[in-house]
């Protein structure tokens, strides 16, 4: 493999055996591509804003005399960039401007004569923009729009599986689901009549809808039934014979023709009989007259002489009717062909229960069902029915819906109209009847071919369309109302409804979620999440077991492991690593094409529907060097089942072993050795890991770490290759390579790093450079690490030396014993940043004021505030300290005589304001790291605000001028090159000031042109600098746009350093979680023969029952990796020659490595080898990909290479006594995470506090400063111990005995430790409730 200079710093040894045919795709593309489709100009008008505009415009007036047409749209530039939006608490959005054309037609002139055209650009509100990382900044917070998995539009055939009716009869139904519009359901009832429902309302006989479509009874029967023709010849009844129809029936009479008996009476008719009848070409047979009785006629029969109706279509024939028909000259009678087997009489039966008999009555019936209580008129009924399924404004199947609809009905074309046609409705009914007749299957609703993904772009477009439709109504009114000659398009459009619809979606939709920003993995996973909940989706309560379960079609599309535990299990899923959506929104996954038994590198993406037609081999099938399968029988999947196929039957092969799982699960090494339940916990807990102070790469990884770190966007990645020209903590400057420059630019890339910013979860976001001056970098190299990344790899936790052994009960029930060394070395120390805001409002009694002059507060409390009343940066504060002094005016109150006296003596006037300062919440302490002051436009800024403003201006100017200097330097080096090549002497040139270089003239015309071009660039650069500086200055000095009634907002940022302590939750990556029970002194920890103590002691009993053996393998492999690191470290300390070092490292990389993925150190320079060795000192990082990991033998080999016992167990000694433990203990390195469930956030105690209003019991929970619930079972415990007085105290004075509480307080103050329990308030509530039932209950005094 070829490595860039940066990648050579540390190479992960890969145990993967399968070649990487397809690189891991960009992990956020599902979000970015979808939103890109929404906002980019689409000339076809298929999707995005363009489609929304075209679907609503042109808007015509009611009279048709004028219309408003849509021409085009453009998105402006956002006012603030992403960081400014986050600081100011505003939405990162761009203004949408739409060019509209108002066309007014002449009234009297012929149609289409234009009187006037007015074109104008109209502002239509703001559209939130997506940041580069796939998030939205809404009101200053980062949010993610989660993709939704919903039922695809189309037609679905289903059954109730016999659950509806008591008899257990299976009832079939069909449902036509449009993208928008009314649902149409057809269903059978237990009597086998077919009914229809519209929008799940009450059911009507299905033939009503056919009558509404203008079909007569005859036509309806003609559509759904084959005919049996009887002829009366010579007073005998003959039947036209189609032999195939007789199969399986029992003959009720001798079937004979031409004197030959084919089937005797009472015999079952078999295929042999039918073959004979066909062979002899029998067309008619004579039947007894009784045979026709009970048959149903297919059309009306009229006596032609009198015009009298003898029998109507769908009537049952009787012998009397037959006689009548014969008399009136009808010799040929057509009846419906039905049987019990596969031609049921369902429609014929349904026509009988249908109360309507013509189109009008059917329309009226539908109108009554849809609008009960309204009197139907013909016009209203017709327009209602027309609008239900046949109007493009009200009904749309969408391209997906039409495709699914036509495929389901086995039609050839997959495109068509978005509305229903007569044929559509009839074909659905026909297919439903076929299924009832036993032909065809019902659909599997959980098949991923029937569920599609709706991503950000599509949902935003739908919301936008909703807004436009609201505007459309208003525009129609305006066009009809008034004087069109003076009106312009912008007078017609009110942007409010559009803004409101978009704002509502991004701000408060169920699928617009507060981004989970614990660490880079949680960000990526959140953006790749797929939810079945949300508008138009399922609800938790209604979702059954089937929907939540893993389905065979999830393979390679949706992860079978990563899903929440709890009520949402299976409803919220995660996208698999390689999955993507196709044009219709269905998930597809890549496969390698197999041609004639040879696996090629050609890649096809298949959706769940297409996949069903192929045989697909697993990724771990063994291939030879030409790509042939080694085994004759290959394990494959076909139609959702796994079985063995011969190698020439195989069509496709999986791309990668990690194709099945999601990003989160693909980060668990040895996942294949973990039980699925624990793997689920492991994948979920990685997302809760808090970024530690110093990130530490996992010794045992899976090779996915780099992809996650880079794609998450927390690292700074080089856009173009070049050389590092300048680097400090907050900025990296790259001089771009010549071949990657755009013509006529300075060739300098500047990366500003994020420093100590707060994330959504209050963790700390901080970027640190990982390149040094003069290093070459290539495009895609990581320049700076973000939170939880180490040299461009995801690093969620720390590598800890663990031992599996019991230790004095301190690891009972998954508790974890931790060494003090872990605390000393700050291995799990995390920084948390909290934002506290103080808002100064304009109240009825006057404005609130931010000031240091606060009534009744001592000097000590004000010591950390400046003269404006705002805390200093760098101040260390604890719970209760004032951060921002604020006073609120209060109304004049009646003064007590004492207060009057005091005021008379001291002239104190401060009592008309009350203290409403911002204080540090209880239990929080930390350091103030930043203060932001926002002042409303037109309100005078205080001193602190001006200081901050001045500081920001200085910083902005410094940043920009440094940027200018860097760019100037780059430009002048190019000017110098031109001048020198044009004949100017270098020495003389260097003596001349740089500004004068551009005054020189060159004789070579081409060089002179180049020089003039560069001079122009220089002027442009300076002009650009002035412009940028001015813009920055305007932004900084401009007042802020605050909510109505708010004068000022002060935001204070507190940084808290949290060390690990008992009560914190930790976990490995295999679902092995626990709580720290004790921090043990280093000298008491078990140690090995070299005197090295372990860091963590885990309980061995946590492994067997949970079946997550991956943790043990990880521990062994981690030990081997560390052992190799130790040997490299020893070699470096002894300063052995590079050749030896190179040879040893090469041996380690070659061990168990596949030929295709060899690391060749011979291409590395000595310096590069030394630097690699330096980075391998703490252990050689290892990748063991999911389902393709290290084998047991390979781990043993690696342990041997690191001079460690191959059992992975060593002898330990007790740190307290020095005695040897009685058997060897498994010791190794496991990657441990500290989860965001910290004891500091959960610890809580209360003496007195707030009480609930009705029951007068203390509130619950830390947020309400509540008490501990002493529940039913606790009461039983005290009863069992006979602790009556304690129990009385718990139920009265410590809970809801109001008088007793007050008395007790007084007694304690007086030093009298007595209590007088009274009546608990909740008993009084009970009395009141009983009285409200009309039962008078009184307490009698003894």
Swiss-Prot record:
Gene3D superfamilies for this protein: 2.40.50.100, 2.40.50.150, 3.90.1100.10, 6.10.140.1670, DNA-directed RNA polymerase, beta subunit, external 1 domain, DNA-directed RNA polymerase, subunit 2, domain 6, RNA polymerase alpha subunit dimerisation domain, RNA polymerase Rpb2, domain 2
Q: Would you tell me the Gene Ontology cellular component terms?
A: DNA-directed RNA polymerase complex
Which EC numbers does the record give?
2.7.7.6
Instruction: Return the broad EC class.
Output: transferase
One Pfam entry for this protein is: RNA_pol_Rpb2_7
Question: Could you tell me the keywords of this UniProt record?
Answer: DNA-directed RNA polymerase, Nucleotidyltransferase, Transcription, Transferase
Q: What GO terms are given for molecular function?
A: DNA binding; DNA-directed RNA polymerase activity; ribonucleoside binding
The catalytic activity, as recorded, is: RNA(n) + a ribonucleoside 5'-triphosphate = RNA(n+1) + diphosphate
Among PROSITE patterns, the record links this protein to: RNA_POL_BETA
Any one Gene Ontology biological process term? DNA-templated transcription
Assembly notes: The RNAP catalytic core consists of 2 alpha, 1 beta, 1 beta' and 1 omega subunit. When a sigma factor is associated with the core the holoenzyme is formed, which can initiate transcription.
The function of this protein is: DNA-dependent RNA polymerase catalyzes the transcription of DNA into RNA using the four ribonucleoside triphosphates as substrates.
> Which PANTHER family does its entry note?
DNA-DIRECTED RNA POLYMERASE I SUBUNIT 2
Q: Which NCBIfam families match?
A: PRK00405.1, rpoB
Can you name this protein?
Answer: DNA-directed RNA polymerase subunit beta
Species name: Salmonella gallinarum (strain 287/91 / NCTC 13346)
Taxonomy of the source species? Bacteria, Pseudomonadati, Pseudomonadota, Gammaproteobacteria, Enterobacterales
Q: Which gene encodes it?
A: rpoB
């Amino acid at each position: 493999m070829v490595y860039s200079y940066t990648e050579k710093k540390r190479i992960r040894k890969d145990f993967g055996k399968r070649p990487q045919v397809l690189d891991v795709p960009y992990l956020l593309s599902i979000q970015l591509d979808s939103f890109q489709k929404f906002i980019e100009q689409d000339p076809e008008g298929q999707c995005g804003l363009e489609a929304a505009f075209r679907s609503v415009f042109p808007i015509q007036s009611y009279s048709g005399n004028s219309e408003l047409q849509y021409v085009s749209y453009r998105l402006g530039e956002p006012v603030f960039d992403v960081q400014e939006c986050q600081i100011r608490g505003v939405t990162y959005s761009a203004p949408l401007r739409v060019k509209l054309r108002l066309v007014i037609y002449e009234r009297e002139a012929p149609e289409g004569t234009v009187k006037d055209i007015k074109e104008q650009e109209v502002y239509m509100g703001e559209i939130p923009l997506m940041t580069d990382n796939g998030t939205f900044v809404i009101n200053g917070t980062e949010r993610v729009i989660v993709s939704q998995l919903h039922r695809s539009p189309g037609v679905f055939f289903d059954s109730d599986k016999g659950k509806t009716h008591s008899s257990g009869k299976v009832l079939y139904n069909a449902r036509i689901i449009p993208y928008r519009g009314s649902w149409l359901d057809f269903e059978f009832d237990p009597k086998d009549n077919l009914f229809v429902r519209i929008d799940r309302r009450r059911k009507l006989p299905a033939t009503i809808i056919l009558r509404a479509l203008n079909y007569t009874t005859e036509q309806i029967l003609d559509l759904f039934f084959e005919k049996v023709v009887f002829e009366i010849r010579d007073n005998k009844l003959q039947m036209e014979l189609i032999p195939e129809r007789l199969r399986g029936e029992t003959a009720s009479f001798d079937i004979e023709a031409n004197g030959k008996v084919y089937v005797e009476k009472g015999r079952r008719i078999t295929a042999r009989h039918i073959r004979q009848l066909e062979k002899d070409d029998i067309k008619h047979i004579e039947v007894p007259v009784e045979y026709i009785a009970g048959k149903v006629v297919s059309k009306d029969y009229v006596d032609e002489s009198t015009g009298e109706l003898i029998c109507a279509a769908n009537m049952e024939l009787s012998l009397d009717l037959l006689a009548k028909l014969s008399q009136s000259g009808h010799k040929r009678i057509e009846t419906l062909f039905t049987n019990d087997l596969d031609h049921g009489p369902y429609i014929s039966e349904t026509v009988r229960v249908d109360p309507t008999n013509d189109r009008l009555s059917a329309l009226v019936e539908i109108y009554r069902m849809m609008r009960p209580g309204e009197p139907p008129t013909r016009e209203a009924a017709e327009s209602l029915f027309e609008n239900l399924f046949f109007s493009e404004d009200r009904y749309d199947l969408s391209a997906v819906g039409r495709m699914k609809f036509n495929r389901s009905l086995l039609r050839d074309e997959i495109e068509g109209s978005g509305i229903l046609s007569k044929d559509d409705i009839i074909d659905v009914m026909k297919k439903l009847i076929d299924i009832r007749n036993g032909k065809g299957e019902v659909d599997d609703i959980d098949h991923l071919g029937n569920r599609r993904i709706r991503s950000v772009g599509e949902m935003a477009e739908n919301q936008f369309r909703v807004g436009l439709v609201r505007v459309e109504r208003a525009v129609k009114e305006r066009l009809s109302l008034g004087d069109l000659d003076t009106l312009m398009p912008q007078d017609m459009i009110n942007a409010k409804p559009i803004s409101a619809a978009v704002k509502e979606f991004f701000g408060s939709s169920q699928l617009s979620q507060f981004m989970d920003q614990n660490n880079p993995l949680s960000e990526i996973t959140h953006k790749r999440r797929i939810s079945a909940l949300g508008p138009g989706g399922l609800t938790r309560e209604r979702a059954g077991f089937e929907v939540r379960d893993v389905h065979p079609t999830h393979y390679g599309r949706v992860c079978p492991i990563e899903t929440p535990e709890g009520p949402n299990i299976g409803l919220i899923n995660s996208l698999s690593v390689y999955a993507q959506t196709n044009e219709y929104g269905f998930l597809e996954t890549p496969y390698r094409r197999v041609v004639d038994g040879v696996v090629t590198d050609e890649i096809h993406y298949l959706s769940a529907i297409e996949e069903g037609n192929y045989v697909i081999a697993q990724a771990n099938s063994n291939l030879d060097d030409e790509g042939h399968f080694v085994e004759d029988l290959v394990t494959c999947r076909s139609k959702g089942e796994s079985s063995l196929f011969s190698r020439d039957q195989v069509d496709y092969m999986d791309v990668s072993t990690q194709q099945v799982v999601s990003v989160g699960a693909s980060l668990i090494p040895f996942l294949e050795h973990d039980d699925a339940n624990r793997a689920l916990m492991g994948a979920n807990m990685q997302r809760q890991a808090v970024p530690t102070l110093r990130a530490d790469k996992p010794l045992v990884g899976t090779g996915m770490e780099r992809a996650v770190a880079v794609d998450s966007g927390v690292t700074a990645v080089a856009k173009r290759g070049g050389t590092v020209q300048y680097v400090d903590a907050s900025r990296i400057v790259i001089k771009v390579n010549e071949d990657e420059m755009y013509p006529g630019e300075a060739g300098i890339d500047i990366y500003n790093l994020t420093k100590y910013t707060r994330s959504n979860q209050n963790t700390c976001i901080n970027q640190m450079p990982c390149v040094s001056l003069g290093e070459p970098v290539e495009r895609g190299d990581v320049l700076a690490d973000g939170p939880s990344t180490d040299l461009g790899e995801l690093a969620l936790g720390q590598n800890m030396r663990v031992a599996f052994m019991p230790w004095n009960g301190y690891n009972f029930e998954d508790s974890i014993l931790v060494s003090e060394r872990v605390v000393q070395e700050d291995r799990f120390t995390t920084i948390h940043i909290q934002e506290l805001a103080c808002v100064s409002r304009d109240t009825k009694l006057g404005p609130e004021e931010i000031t240091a002059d606060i009534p009744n507060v001592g000097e000590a409390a004000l010591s950390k505030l400046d003269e404006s009343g705002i805390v200093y940066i760098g101040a260390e504060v604890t719970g209760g300290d004032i951060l921002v002094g604020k006073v609120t005016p209060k109304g004049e109150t009646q003064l007590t005589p004492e207060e009057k006296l005091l005021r008379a003596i001291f002239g104190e006037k401060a009592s008309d304001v009350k203290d409403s300062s911002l204080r540090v919440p209880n239990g929080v302490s930390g350091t103030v790291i930043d203060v932001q002051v926002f002042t409303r436009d037109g309100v005078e800024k205080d001193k602190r605000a001006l200081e901050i403003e001045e500081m920001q201006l200085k910083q902005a100017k410094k940043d920009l001028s440094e940027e200018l200097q860097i760019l100037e330097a780059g430009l002048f080096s190019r000017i110098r090159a031109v001048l020198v090549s044009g004949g100017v002497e270098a020495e003389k040139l260097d003596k001349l000031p740089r500004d004068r270089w551009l005054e020189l003239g060159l004789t070579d015309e081409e060089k002179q042109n180049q020089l003039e071009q560069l001079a122009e660039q220089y002027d442009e650069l300076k002009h650009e600098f002035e412009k940028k500086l001015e813009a920055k200055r305007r932004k900084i000095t401009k007042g802020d746009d605050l909510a109505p009634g708010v004068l000022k907002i002060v935001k204070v940022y507190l940084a808290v350093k949290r060390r690990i302590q008992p009560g914190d939750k930790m976990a490995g990556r295999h679902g092995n979680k626990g709580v720290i029970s004790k921090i043990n002194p280093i000298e008491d920890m078990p140690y090995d023969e070299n005197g090295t103590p372990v860091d963590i002691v885990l309980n061995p009993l946590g492994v067997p029952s949970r079946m997550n053996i991956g943790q043990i393998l990880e521990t062994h492999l981690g030990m081997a990796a560390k052992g190799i690191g130790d040997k490299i470290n020893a070699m470096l300390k002894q300063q052995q020659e590079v050749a030896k070092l190179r040879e040893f490292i090469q041996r380690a990389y070659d061990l168990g490595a596949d030929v295709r993925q060899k690391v060749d150190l011979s291409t590395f320079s000595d310096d590069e080898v030394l630097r690699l060795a330096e980075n391998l000192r703490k252990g050689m990082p290892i990748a063991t990909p999911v389902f393709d990991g290290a084998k047991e033998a390979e781990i043993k080999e690696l342990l041997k290479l690191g001079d460690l016992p191959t059992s992975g167990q060593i002898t330990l000694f007790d740190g307290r006594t020095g005695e040897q433990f009685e058997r060897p203990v498994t010791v190794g390195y496991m990657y441990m995470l500290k989860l965001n469930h910290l004891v500091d956030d959960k610890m809580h105690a209360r003496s007195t506090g707030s009480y609930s209003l009705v029951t007068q019991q203390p509130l619950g929970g830390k947020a309400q400063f509540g008490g501990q619930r002493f529940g039913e079972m606790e009461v039983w415990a005290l009863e069992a111990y006979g602790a009556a007085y304690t129990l009385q105290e718990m139920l009265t004075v410590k809970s809801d005995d109001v008088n007793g509480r007050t008395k007790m307080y007084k007694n304690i103050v007086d030093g009298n430790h007595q209590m007088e329990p009274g009546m608990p308030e909740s008993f009084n509530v009970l009395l009141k409730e009983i009285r409200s039932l009309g039962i008078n209950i009184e307490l009698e005094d003894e």
